[in-house]
Amino acid sequence: MKGHTAAYRATRGVVGHRFPGLPQMLLLDHVGAKSGRRRTSPLVYARDGHDLVIVASKGGHPRNPAWFHNLRANPDTTVQVGSKRIPVRARVATPAERDRLWEKAVEVYGGYREYQLRTEREIPLVVLAPRR
């Protein structure tokens, strides 16, 4: 992951945003909820209008990923999508929009369906809305 993040940043997304046969990736900056340390996670994303949608799957693990908890504590952050750095505010998708956003996410990466079958928790979707 560190190598992916470093290459993505160094090339302004030329390396790391898209790989042949794989879904597009963004870099999510987040601040540790307990530690306060800045972290970066490369994640698959889907688009929903101007918003970006990320999936807290952790490969179907029983617990949510650390970045999810970090965003709940510190929702104002930045993502890098290709060469663009975008300030965003994170929020958990509402029940009313979840099914529609889940289908968008699965269109980008079908493995999310299998991840959901591996775990008893409902995998959260996080909407990243651009801040103005």
Language-model-detected regions and their locations in the chain:
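Short beta-strand segments
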Residues: 23-57
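Short beta-strand element of the conserved SAM-dependent methyltransferase core
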Residues: 28, 126-131
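Alpha-helical membrane-targeting segments
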Residues: 1-24
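Short hydrophobic/aromatic beta-strand or adjacent loop that forms the aromatic wall/cage
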Residues: 25, 122-125
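A generic local structural motif
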Residues: 12-14, 40-41, 113
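Short, structured beta-strand-loop surface elements
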Residues: 58-112, 118-122, 130-132
